[in-house]
């Protein structure tokens, strides 16, 4: 834990105090006897004491010995426990592809932030789809309305042609 804390101190010293700094950690390496969630809670507590603004709770994935149970929101419990036991702001990751699932993580207080990585790679329009699914009134800026699939059928140039 000493080396990453030294790195954090050096970054904090060089970075403007009023700008946030977060640290992404592997909350467990999924190996018996390896780095675990209890270690991550202690590490996150140290980071908070040094002024860290948030922790992104990811997990390992580098050993053949790891025993990972993968499924929707499978890494959320790590962020939840770190948040509960340290009070630091946490960001949850881990197959939060479905907008309602991602929202529930926030609403239920399991994390303060979420990150969508692979879900955005698979669906670059994820934020728009999520907003629509969750009932937000999303509008394209006028110059970009043509790119919205439901507006492409509409004759947006009709008024221009009639004026000519």
Where are these regions (language model features)?
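Flavin-dependent oxidoreductase catalytic cores
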Residues: 1-164
